[in-house]
């Protein structure tokens, strides 16, 4: 990510009266050479680490619709107050995020359904996944099944090798931009450093076209 678009260089309010706000903030984010367009067009190739390529994938179909730059600045300030390096703050954020996802459990627009947590937890307990195995959901939505699997697998982590297996334990695919973004965030909240969820249509590729690496 270019230096000017890193959070610390534009979002943090240093209380010196220089923080971006109002129309200036909206232009910085939405402009032709702004934040969103830059992240949508980051150079990515087959050798790009997953932790970097995921940024382009997340922003590829996203737009920023807020019209009030002052309100947007207030939201940014609230987010910046969260210390993601602090276990308590991270846990609190995770609880809030879980609450947001619960609000999406009823049927949404276009016939979308969000699977209740109780059901995903039950199915994972039935499957009994083990570290070293892969747990996949290829219509992953907001990541409910994957995070239930992570909660189950996290209890098995005892060593550094276990932690590495935990980081690579789940894979997913999701076509719609909003659920995809929510699923990425959901895995980050569950301590997955580079979520392996692809932004693609699982039904668009024939089984015979998959390679061994896939």
Tell me what each language-model feature is.
Residues 1-131, 196-207:
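Non-catalytic, mostly N-terminal accessory regions of nucleic-acid modification and defense proteins
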Residues 112-213:
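Conserved S-adenosyl-L-methionine
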Residues 1, 213-214:
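Internal hydrophobic scaffold segments of catalytic domains
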């Amino acid at each position: 990510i270019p230096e000017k678009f890193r959070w610390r260089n534009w979002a943090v309010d240093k209380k010196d009266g220089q923080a971006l706000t109002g129309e200036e903030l909206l232009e910085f984010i939405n402009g032709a050479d702004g934040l969103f367009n830059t992240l949508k067009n980051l150079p990515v190739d087959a050798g790009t680490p997953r932790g970097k390529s995921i940024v382009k994938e997340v922003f590829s179909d996203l737009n920023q619709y807020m019209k009030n730059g002052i309100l947007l600045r207030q939201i940014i300030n609230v987010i910046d107050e969260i210390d993601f390096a602090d276990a308590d703050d991270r846990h609190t954020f995770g609880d809030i995020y879980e609450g947001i996802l619960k609000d999406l459990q009823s049927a949404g627009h276009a016939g979308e359904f969000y699977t209740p947590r109780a059901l995903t937890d039950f199915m994972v307990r039935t499957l009994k996944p083990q570290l070293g195995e892969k747990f996949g959901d290829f219509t992953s939505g907001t990541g409910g099944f994957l995070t239930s699997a992570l909660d189950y697998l996290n209890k098995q982590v005892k060593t550094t090798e276990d932690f590495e297996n935990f980081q690579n334990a789940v894979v997913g695919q999701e076509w719609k931009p909003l659920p995809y973004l929510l699923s990425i965030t959901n895995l980050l909240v569950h301590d997955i450093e580079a979520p392996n969820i692809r932004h693609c249509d699982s039904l668009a590729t024939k089984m015979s076209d998959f390679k061994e690496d896939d």
